[in-house]
């Protein structure tokens, strides 16, 4: 009987957790202040999302940047997840750098603001 109650509680918890959808919060920034022609790291940190069905791409003028690195998917309290993707780059004047995030059926693009 105890096993049945435990299983039932597990099922209720599973359904409750699976039923909550949270949109991602996205931050796009660089490791150092942006300076044209100087090597830097472009970072896209995505947090607070559920379920963990997500794709992150770093872009230069709409094209996917190669040689990116991605952290392992991790979760926070409340079963919300976070993930970070980064790449080494040299900002060029007139180029647009961005992070594309697809979560579930929603896709958004977030631009990097170099503050130069």
From Swiss-Prot:
Primary subcellular site in the record, as a coarse category: secreted
SMART domains hit by this protein: IGc1
Example GO biological process: antigen processing and presentation of peptide antigen via MHC class I
Subcellular location: Secreted
Disulfide feature: 44-99
Signal peptide: 1-19
Entry keyword set: Disulfide bond, Immunity, Immunoglobulin domain, MHC I, Secreted, Signal
GO cellular component: extracellular region; MHC class I protein complex
Any one Pfam family match given in the protein's UniProt record, by short name: C1-set
Record-stated family: Belongs to the beta-2-microglobulin family.
Subunit structure: Heterodimer of an alpha chain and a beta chain. Beta-2-microglobulin is the beta-chain of major histocompatibility complex class I molecules.
Function summary: Component of the class I major histocompatibility complex (MHC). Involved in the presentation of peptide antigens to the immune system.
Protein name in the entry: Beta-2-microglobulin
Phylogenetic classification of the source organism: Eukaryota, Metazoa, Chordata, Craniata, Vertebrata
Gene that specifies this protein: b2m
């Amino acid at each position: 009987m105890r096993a049945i109650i435990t299983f039932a509680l597990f099922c209720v918890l599973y359904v409750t957790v699976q039923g909550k959808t949270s949109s991602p919060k996205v931050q796009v920034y660089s490791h150092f202040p942006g300076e044209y022609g100087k090597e830097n790291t472009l970072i896209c940190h995505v947090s607070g999302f559920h379920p963990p069905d997500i794709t992150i791409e770093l872009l230069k003028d709409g094209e996917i940047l190669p040689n990116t690195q991605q952290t392992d998917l991790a979760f926070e309290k409340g079963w919300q997840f976070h993930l970070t993707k980064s790449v080494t780059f040299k900002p060029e004047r007139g180029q647009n750098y961005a992070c594309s995030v697809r979560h579930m059926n929603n896709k958004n693009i977030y631009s990097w603001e170099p503050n130069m």
